[in-house]
Structures are given as structure tokens and as C-alpha cells.
Amino acid sequence: MTQQTDTTFEVGTQLEPAPGRHGRTGVIHTPHGSIQTPAFIPVATKATVKTLTPEQIRSTGAQAILSNAYHLYLQPGPDIVDEAGGVAAFENWHGPTYTDSGGFQVMSLGVGFKKVLAMDTAGLTEGDIRAANKDRMARVDDDGVDFKSVIDGSSHRFTPEVSMQIQHQLGADIMFAFDELTTLIDTRGYQEHSVERTRRWARRCLIEHDRLTEVRADKPLQSLWGVVQGAQYEDPVSYTHLTL
């Protein structure tokens, strides 16, 4: 049986307390090594950092890498990564790994640029927004997201449970709860509704994560982290932070 090791965080130095001063250093201890924080984490979308070998990535000082559940779900498939021994073995990376939930890609690639809109929204009209929504490839409801593959247009559905199942097969040390991506053009009312949805999804993720941890007891322990949402509104952001 594989040795089980929890992921833990140890605080190092902290700035002197003052309004707006919350900086600190620390160490994240994972089953596959430690990460000194703050840290730059390269993105290996499809289990590879494009143009770089694992040795070259390590030579940059990178301590961990992050891969994407959405893209690995579509190609080559989480079952293949699982059979290879998990995402670290699959990409020949000897160190800590992260996977994101796939939520960002499901919604951003499905809805198009309006879902990942930049800060400047001054040039948009209601007609622009309606036109973008007509052709979007993702639909969100309280249970999950229906979307079409960017590869072949096939239909798929992600729920919190599906995201956890995929990420457990990918086997990263740290994974993220499935959350809803919103935009700066969404109303405050929608942002607040979305925050509640993200909280409910996080609880469902935790329940499924606990179940899969028992089912896959021969695998290294994986740590589940939440995602703070609320866009540019301070109260929803604080609420998410305090309740996740």
C-alpha cells in the first residue's frame, strides 16, 4: 500500500500587522515534496509545459506544476493518466503537482470572450452581450455545466462530482473544487447567486472527495482546496472566503 501523507501548510515569516498588510512566507508540504511560498507555478495544460522538458522546467526554479482537468479529460482521458500512475508520472515530473477543476475552461471556452472579459467593459452594449450568449457553448445550472468540446463539438456535462472523479484519476497532490466563473459584466445580484452556487458545489466536491479517498485508499492522499469568487464586489468575496 502507498504511504499516505497529508498536505500541510506551515507559516514562515509575516509582515508586521497593519491595514492592507497580510504578506507572509510559508511552506506547503505535499506527498511529493514541499513548496516554498509565495511561488510561481508553471502551467502544464495537457501535462506538459510547451517547448520545455521536465529538466528545463526544474532549472527555472519551479517547485510544482499545474495541469488542467478539462483538457486532460478531453485528451488523452483521465483513465489513461491514471493507468500511467497519475499526472506526475505521466509528465515525468518529480515533485508536487496541482490540477484545476476544469470549471474555468468549461465556461470560458464555452461562452467565449464575454465570459473572461477584461476590466474594460465600456464598449459593450446589451446587444453585444445577447449576441454572445446566443452562440455560447456552455450552459450553467445549479447542478453543473453542459458544454461542447472545443475539439469536436461533442456534448459533455461537468458536475462537482465529475470534476472530483476526474481529478482523483489525475492524481495531483492538490486539486481545486469545481466553481462557477463569472464576469465583470454580471450584476451584483448574479455574483451573489453564483457565490452561493460555488459554495454548494464546494460542499458536494468535499463529499465526493471523501468518498473517493476511501475508494482509492491505496493512492497517495490528495488535498482539496476551495476557490474564492465574487468578482469585484468585496462583500461576496469576503463571504466566500469566510464560508468555504
Question: What would you call each of these model-derived segments?
Answer:
Residues 99, 226-228:
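Structural beta-sheet core signal
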Residues 229-237:
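Active-site glycine- and acidic-residue-rich loops that bind
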Residues 187-188, 236-238:
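A short secondary-structure junction signal
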